């Protein structure tokens, strides 16, 4: 081992002989420092290349919509991984933040202690229900795109045992988990089925309330999606939809807008989005609905995107302890942030649509 006495005098090995840098031949000094510089340069270039490659990969959407099975498989995987359930709880949708919540910093890194992420989702359900103006005790409720059944069970608890809530999803794993949680929570009035929302197996005029929270994003035919929900709704029943929407046009989308929308379509298996106004037109176009109304809840929900990221910062162990999901989680974080920015600059909007059915379906 080499030791230094007093002033630093670097040394290196030539053959079996240790040579001081100060007394080394000029060519040896040149070789030493040139080699070190080359090594550091190569390392720097390697890191730069790796960073460029990673950014390119993260900016390239990797989970495009292909068919309904694509959506079912994605949610099957998320359900089995349990990471989404750990951070998002039983509700796979955004939360609701009042002006007072936002003023206190809810949804920020430190604001995670102001309002719990899962609490925000329960608040969303209650606010959506109030906005729907649904009668107090509907006999039958349909939850379209129910996930693992968080909202279905919340509605079953809210309305009581006299209300039967049915949730449908394309994911068999979600139905399994939703059913398991309903049994654990002693909620026999909440049931779940694997079913395509575009081809529902229910008779016309069945439900008093049809509830669709963040399921329209995955629908390849928005018109059919709306028409099917209206078909199974009873006369006098209420339809309420919460969904991510792209802004209306004009003005036309810029090239940057189109690039961002393409990413948001293809990273989380969305065929396409439509505007809030387009949804209202589809509901009105069924000719059996009245009192169609809309709202934009971007302000009330936008904090959710980063809130979900900060929840992981405060509680990273579930991800760090499972290296096999690091990359997928990183991709999801990137998409969450890109969603937040798209909503923040008005490219995306959080659409709320409701209406009352006035006559029976043919």
Task: Name every feature range the model reports, one short phrase each.
Residues 140-142, 148-199:
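Class I SAM-dependent methyltransferase SAM/SAH-binding core
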Residues 223-238:
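A short glycine-rich, Lys/Arg-flanked "PGG" loop and its adjoining helix->strand segment in the class I
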Residues 198-210:
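A short acidic, Gly/Pro-enriched loop at the edge of an enzyme's catalytic core
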Residues 96-108, 118-139:
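Conserved alpha-helix/loop element of class I SAM-dependent methyltransferases that forms part
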Residues 241-243:
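Acidic carboxylate diad motif detector
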Residues 31-87:
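N-terminal auxiliary segments of SAM/dcSAM-dependent transferases
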Residues 208-221:
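A short SAM/SAH-binding and catalytic strip from SAM-dependent methyltransferases
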Residues 252-350, 358-359:
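Substrate-binding/catalytic lobe of Class I Rossmann-like enzymes that use SAM or dcSAM, i.e.
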